[in-house]
């Protein structure tokens, strides 16, 4: 598990009874480099995303998981509003009572349309941003 800082780790450990018995060695405090992250996605079938409770938008992990064509389990219910949402590939669980049906993990990833993948490529995002700008000259 990753924490942005040791201070956050200790704060969460004090606040969350489930972390009280955890060892600091079980956590990372530096982000993975690009190659390590890609290798981790390559080896994974399913990715878990636990977003901040007040966050409504998606984490980068959600976008990366779609791009990696891996299944996603997330605590963010807003993911159901996105065009790439497919209940076969993405499971939004209740933060307080996360239930993951066995069938979700056992079923294969279902491809989504190439057009949807294209919408989330960085070059497409940049084109969308720059095409929407109005230049005064």
Describe the role of every protein-language-model region.
Residues 1-55, 59, 75-79, 122-137:
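Nucleotide-sugar donor-binding catalytic core of glycosyltransferases
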Residues 12-16, 64, 87-90:
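Short low-complexity, flexible loop/linker segments enriched in glycine and/or proline
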Residues 21-25, 67, 71-137:
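Pol beta-like nucleotidyltransferase catalytic core
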Residues 42-44, 64-69:
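Conserved donor-binding/catalytic loop of nucleotide-activated donor transferases
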Residues 59-62, 84-85:
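A short acidic (Asp/Glu
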